[in-house]
């Protein structure tokens, strides 16, 4: 059912992922001021003359973000109408629109008015949530028409643990974005020690970097527990099991890419992979959260 909606939702999901990676590229290359303090124009021009590479990166991000934002709104309206009989469709459609608007306002505000590092870090976190909302709408489009949707019966304790893990994952995403915006990516040399110290303190750029290392490592342990719990108690739910295993594999990849950033001196490709993996991980956990909150069959 809804073949065109399925195709469109997949394309939109890919578009959101591209916007997310473009945003990470803007931050990694310091291109946030590539268009000066003007928005939506670039240095007051529709097409900037003799643009520097930073200008091209920033302005292309704005253009693609605008196009994908329009695509998300269309998807939300389409899903609201075609999937309204599905439990999560309206809430996800509403969330997708609100998140993309909020994301755009944060980006525009950062350019025109400037923002603190704490506020700027929200931008990437909202992007991850926006991706998750669109991905879940895409999944709903593919689920529609099936005799039974995935609705595993799990314990209350398991549900609460998943809620805790996804909330904690978002906090880790925020801490990583804060590290980037505070230019603390290379504040800790070496691994596992930080500048030759077991505990360098929690102040300044070094503290921000070290804190992110610690909370990231703890996330890996939390997802290991989630995988073991799922395999031991809910192995008969194949989708739930594979989501838990995938989440753990993703966080392992995230851990490795994070270490690689230090040893490659913040190589651009490694940094983008780091941003990509955590965004996919958050979407996977969002899917798990969605299916375990459904009334069981």
UniProtKB/Swiss-Prot annotation:
Residue ranges annotated as Extracellular topological domain: 28-62, 115-118, 178-210, 264-271
Residue intervals annotated with topology Cytoplasmic: 1-6, 84-93, 140-156, 232-242, 293-297
Catalytic activity: Fe(II)-heme o + 2 A + H2O = Fe(II)-heme a + 2 AH2
GO MF term (any one): oxidoreductase activity, acting on NAD(P)H, heme protein as acceptor
Record keywords: Cell membrane, Disulfide bond, Heme biosynthesis, Iron, Membrane, Metal-binding, Oxidoreductase, Transmembrane, Transmembrane helix
Residue positions of the active site: 58
Disulfide bridge map: 35-42, 188-194
Binding site for heme b: 212, 274
Cited PANTHER family: HEME A SYNTHASE
Family, per entry: Belongs to the COX15/CtaA family. Type 1 subfamily.
Protein name from the UniProt record: Heme A synthase
Organism, as annotated: Alkalihalophilus pseudofirmus (strain ATCC BAA-2126 / JCM 17055 / OF4) (Bacillus pseudofirmus)
């Amino acid at each position: 059912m809804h073949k065109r909606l399925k195709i469109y939702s997949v394309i939109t999901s890919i578009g959101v992922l591209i916007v997310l990676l473009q945003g990470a590229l803007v931050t990694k290359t310091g291109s946030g001021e590539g268009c000066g303090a003007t928005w939506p124009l670039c240095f007051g021009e529709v097409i900037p003359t003799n643009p520097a590479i930073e200008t091209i990166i920033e302005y292309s991000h704005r253009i693609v973000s605008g196009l994908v934002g329009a695509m998300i709104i269309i998807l939300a309206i389409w899903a609201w109408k075609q999937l309204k009989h599905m439990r999560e469709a309206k809430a996800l459609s509403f969330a997708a629109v609100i998140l993309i608007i909020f994301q755009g306002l944060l980006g525009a505000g950062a350019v025109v008015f400037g923002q603190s590092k704490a506020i700027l870090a929200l931008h990437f976190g909202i992007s991850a949530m926006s991706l998750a909302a669109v991905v879940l709408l895409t999944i709903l489009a593919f689920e529609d028409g099936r005799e039974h949707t995935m609705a595993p019966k799990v314990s209350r304790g398991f549900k609460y643990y998943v809620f805790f893990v996804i909330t904690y994952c978002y906090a880790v995403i925020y801490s990583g974005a804060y590290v980037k915006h505070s230019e603390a990516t290379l504040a800790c040399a070496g691994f596992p020690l930080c500048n030759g110290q077991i505990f360098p303190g929690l102040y300044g750029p070094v503290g921000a970097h070290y804190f992110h290392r610690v909370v990231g490592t703890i996330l890996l342990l939390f997802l290991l527990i989630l995988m073991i719990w799922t395999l031991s108690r809910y192995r008969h739910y194949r989708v739930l099991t594979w989501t838990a295993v995938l989440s753990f594999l993703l966080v392992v990849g995230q851990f490795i890419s994070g270490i690689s950033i230090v040893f490659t001196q913040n190589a651009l490709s490694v940094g983008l992979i780091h941003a990509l993996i955590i965004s996919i991980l958050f979407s996977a956990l969002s899917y798990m959260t969605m299916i375990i909150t459904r009334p069981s069959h």
